[in-house]
From Swiss-Prot:
InterPro entries: JHD (IPR041070), JHDM1_Histone_Demethylase (IPR050690), JmjC_dom (IPR003347), Zinc_finger_PHD-type_CS (IPR019786), Znf_FYVE_PHD (IPR011011), Znf_PHD (IPR001965), Znf_PHD-finger (IPR019787), Znf_RING/FYVE/PHD (IPR013083). One of its GO terms (cellular component) is nucleoplasm. SUPFAM superfamilies: Clavaminate synthase-like, FYVE/PHD zinc finger. Fe cation binds at H282, D284, H354. Residues 597-633, 677-700, 819-921 are annotated as: Disordered. Substrate binds at T279, K299. Residues 97-114 are annotated as: Linker. PROSITE patterns: JMJC, ZF_PHD_1, ZF_PHD_2. This is Lysine-specific demethylase 7A. Its EC number is 1.14.11.65.
Length: 941
């Protein structure tokens, strides 16, 4: 049979070509391969892209275009005779039609076989059937009403009909636009896919030949064109996609311009069908939604809702060998009929099963698009296509690749929504959960080889899946119950876009492009520029103005540490700068250290994602702290304690030292500490790390405040000539240099956490200026050590001059009971003899500790313990609201704003011999100044 021969033409030619290739034996010179065989009257080699037919007489192969045989005509030829053989044997013999209801019309019509879809008999029966009207389910609306906000709020789960083009954003040619105009814009030589409706089979032909067929009133067959995508042709300039389709489309919003995968073009199709063209029931590839606009003519849609039962029946029907013999509309409860007339536009949602009948010659335009509103259904349809082994030609191009792009961008979107204080929409959370499940499935060991090809280069699959898990878990914990991943929401919460106008983050979010996968890290020049501007401002100010500016700067920069979800709108705009300045010097930088730049990869924005995830986690932890504000009256004893501490500071007493040194005295304090230790052991590891880091930030605030006090000289000490109100002596500059270097070290710990320290700025502005004077000896004692404590370790510290040692622990006053608070006051009031005894015990302990800490180095344990640093300068822990004070343990020796310590006696040097030239503070300071003069400032870095 000539038709069967044409179907196997490719295999026969390929086999002949393979047999003609000779393989050289090892060690012998290979002869040049013979030329490939040639065929047809044109004597050209085999081309897989060109249709060929075999002559049943001479057995030679001919290109259909060379002998005037169309591909869709070849199936009707019984015996084919080539032009040479036709001279002797006559023309080709055609098949005889024996029925009108079967795809193979040569079958004998004995009435025993059912009608198949697409045949003439089937079309007649379909036209005569009665179906429920689609008016029961579809929504008719004006173009201006069809907005993204509407769909996000009400969902996109039923078809939408728009009778007019007004306000749709859809631009099309005039209704006089014909198929000949299509040929003129697209090109007559373009090869297109054509469906032979009676056989429900696909074939190829040129656009010119199809236009010729379309314009012929005597059409031997019913041919339908439904897949002419013209985005890469001149006709694309005549058509603009509806605005709603562009706003929702994954390809338009998430596909990166620099992707190695070619961008899918599925938004602009031209559909040309003659009367009685029929497309059987199907779901559009990849579960895409689709828009149709009838330019002229008419189309009838048969719509079936994608319920779980209907989808299961559809999959079973599609895989059946008798699919064409069963009308799927009879297998479901309801199949709705929707007539789309000239000028009407129909939007079909994800997963809807539909068939299309062209009731009269028609030209229509349409397009497919994936979107966020029904991600779960889209993935379900894609998995169904794979189970049904759908050919790649009928699948969405690079569906899995775009899922990775979308997952990466939706992760960013969810984090931004939670930072801005918006609750993510239900449909979005459901979609991300479905997407996360699909990505995990694709990355399984037994399946990863099938899906690895479509993983983008700039996506780290494992890391992305973990980050999605964290965000989903955090959202579920906030909502108090898991979010269901199945089903389509009928009513969605208010969209994020509806709140953008009132959001302080609107402009920032508007400027951010979702396709931007790179994160720019600020350079050191940016830091220096900001620092220089602040210093120049301060040089022009009086001392009292400087105090005000310092308090404002501290408050401003510390505000950035508060999670953005809890920052009021009037403070949200002051969070740009992250440098902490004191007297014109940088002592703390909250940004990512520059040293980490070498670790950045193509998707380095995940580092920023980690910080945002931690911000989101802290929202839950701070919720318990916010409740503490309501019980502020019950904590008056604790507030009274801090009032007394402030008064002691104003009188230059040793309030903090006394507290530190008398902390462990008395059984009541011991009992109180044990209670807190038990509660600490019950807290999670993440909470401990966050509170530890917040304590280091509080320590930095204490150092900054004390330095500002100590560097303001009394009137008798003001030099006659001053270049700047904040100028200091040479020794003070050296000490401040040490402080600046130490601050940079601490930033590596601080930059990973988010902590609110607003009250520190207020405290600076409220302190009495008369109490801001301190001796240089205090500064030397305060900043003795120059090696920072590693964040997250339980550290034992010893000060050889202060003769004190302390195990730094963490307490959380949000858990205090009134009895504990009164008990803590008793411990704090113990002074005098208890203070002296504590110092003696500390001195003895230092004497017996050996010389392990001779050079000011710390001993660090390798394992994390339940103890965590908590400093009492009034800063807030992650669970403490603004304005709530805290009961704290002894301050770290290098951060404690202690008063003048007792003189160093000879007893201090017993048990260990100090290093030569480093015995006293004066000798050590001289050593530091000498190093500065010799240009060894890098020693401190």
């Amino acid at each position: 049979m000539a038709g069967a021969a044409a179907a196997v033409a490719a295999g026969a030619a390929a086999g002949a070509a393979a047999a003609a290739v000779s393989v050289a034996a090892p060690g012998r010179a290979s002869a040049p391969p013979p030329p490939p065989p040639v065929y047809c009257v044109c004597r050209q080699p085999y081309d897989v892209n060109r249709f060929m037919i075999e002559c049943d007489i001479c057995k030679d192969w001919f290109h259909g275009s060379c002998v005037g045989v169309e591909e869709h005509h070849a199936v009707d030829i019984d015996l084919y005779h080539c032009p040479n053989c036709a001279v002797l044997h006559g023309s080709s013999l055609m098949k005889k039609r024996r029925n009108w209801h079967r795809h193979d019309y040569t079958e004998i019509d004995d009435g025993s076989k059912p009608v198949q879809a697409g045949t003439r008999t089937f079309i007649k029966e379909l036209r005569s059937r009665v179906f429920p009207s689609a008016d029961e389910i579809i929504i008719k609306m004006h173009g201006s009403q069809l907005t993204q906000r509407y769909l996000e709020k009400h969902g996109f789960d039923v078809p939408i009909m728009v009778p007019k083009l007004d306000d749709l954003g859809l631009r099309l040619p005039s209704p006089t636009f014909s198929v000949m105009d299509v040929e003129r814009y697209v090109g007559g030589d373009k090869v297109i896919d054509v469906i032979d409706v009676a056989r429900q089979a696909d074939s190829k032909m040129t656009l010119h030949n199809y236009v010729k067929y379309f314009m012929n009133p005597n059409r031997p067959k019913v041919l339908n064109v439904i897949s002419l995508e013209f985005s890469d042709t001149k006709m694309s300039e005549l058509v603009e996609v509806p605005d709603i389709a562009k706003k929702l489309s994954w390809v338009e919003n998430y596909w990166p311009d620099d992707s190695v995968f070619p961008k899918p073009f599925v938004q602009k199709y031209c559909l040309m069908g003659v009367q009685d063209s029929y497309t059987d029931f199907h779901i559009d590839f990849g579960g895409t939604s689709v828009w149709y606009h009838v330019l002229w003519g008419e189309k009838i849609f048969y719509l079936i809702k994608p319920t779980d039962e209907n989808l299961a029946r559809y999959e079973s029907w599609s895989s059946s060998v008798t699919q064409s013999e069963v009308f799927f509309g009879d297998k479901v409860d309801k199949c709705y009929k929707c007539v789309v007339k000239q000028g009407h536009t129909l939007f079909v949602p994800t997963g809807w099963i539909h068939a299309v009948l062209t009731s009269q010659d028609c030209m229509a335009f349409g397009g497919n698009f994936l979107h966020n509103l029904n991600i779960g259904m889209q993935l379900r349809c894609y998995e169904m296509e794979k189970r049904l082994k759908t050919p790649d030609l009928f699948k969405f191009p690079f569906f899995e690749a775009i899922c990775w792009f979308v997952a990466k961008n939706l992760l960013e979107t969810l984090k931004e929504l939670r930072e801005d204080g918006f609750q993510p929409q239900t449909y979005l959370v459901q979609g991300v959960k479905a997407l996360h499940t699909a990505l995990k499935l694709w990355m399984k060991k037994e399946l990863v080889s099938e899906h690895a090809f479509e993983i983008p280069d700039n996506v780290r699959p494992g890391h992305l899946i973990k980050e999605l898990s964290k965000v989903i878990r955090a959202i579920e914990e906030e909502n108090g119950k898991p979010v269901k991943s199945q089903g389509i929401p009928i009513v969605c919460p208010v969209s994020r876009s509806s709140n953008e106008a009132t959001s302080p983050y609107h402009s920032r979010r508007k400027m951010r492009k979702l396709r931007d996968h790179n994160v720019r890290t600020p350079s050191n020049l940016d830091i220096l520029e900001l620092h220089t501007r602040e210093v120049l401002k301060r040089l022009e100010m009086c001392p009292w103005e400087e105090d005000i500016l310092s308090s404002k700067l501290n408050g401003k920069f510390n505000k950035h540490l508060q999670p953005s979800s809890t920052v009021p709108e009037w403070r949200a705009k002051d969070n740009d700068l992250r440098l902490l300045l004191t007297n014109g010097r940088i002592i703390k930088d909250e940004r990512q250290p520059f040293a980490d730049q070498s670790l950045y990869t193509a998707d380095s924005e995940n580092e920023e994602d980690k910080r945002r995830t931690k911000k989101a986690k802290m929202k839950i932890e701070e919720s318990s702290g916010v409740e503490g504000v309501e019980h502020e009256e019950s904590q008056k004893p604790l507030n009274g304690f801090f009032t007394r501490v402030k008064s002691e500071l104003r009188s230059r007493s040793s309030g903090y030292s006394d507290i530190s040194e008398s902390e462990d005295s008395g059984p009541e304090c011991t009992a109180l500490k044990s209670i807190f230790t038990t509660e600490e052991s019950e807290s999670s590891g993440d909470e401990k790390k966050q509170e530890i880091t917040s304590n280091f930030k509080e320590e930095s605030n204490v150092m900054r405040n004390f330095l500002q006090k100590s560097q303001k000289p009394s009137r008798s000490e003001i030099p006659i000539k001053r270049e700047c109100p904040t100028s200091t002596s040479t020794e003070e500059e050296a000490i401040q240099g040490m402080l600046s270097m130490a601050g940079l070290h601490y930033s590596t710990c601080l930059q990973r956490q988010i902590q609110s320290t607003d009250c520190s700025g207020e405290r600076n502005s409220l302190q009495d200026p008369s109490s801001c004077h301190g001796s240089n000896h205090e500064v030397r004692q305060l900043y003795r050590y120059d090696k920072p404590v590693e964040c997250g370790y339980h550290v034992k510290t010893e000060d050889p001059d202060l003769r004190t040692s302390s195990w730094i622990k963490q307490f959380d006053t949000s858990r205090f009971h009134p009895q504990d608070l009164s008990r803590s006051q008793k411990c704090i009031r113990k002074e005098g003899s208890s203070e002296i005894s504590q110092r003696v015990q500390s001195r003895n302990y230092v004497d017996s500790s050996g010389s392990s800490l001779q050079n000011g180095k710390y001993m660090q344990n390798s394992n994390l313990t339940s103890g965590a640093c908590q400093i009492s300068n009034g800063s807030l822990s992650p669970e403490r609201p603004v304005g709530e004070t805290s009961f704290s343990v002894p301050l770290h020796p290098t951060k404690r704003p202690a008063s003048n310590p007792p003189p160093i006696s000879n007893q201090a040097t017993k048990g260990k011999r100090p290093k030569k030239g480093m015995a006293t503070a004066k000798q050590r300071l001289g050593k530091i100044l000498k190093l500065n003069r010799n240009g060894h400032a890098r020693f401190f870095v």
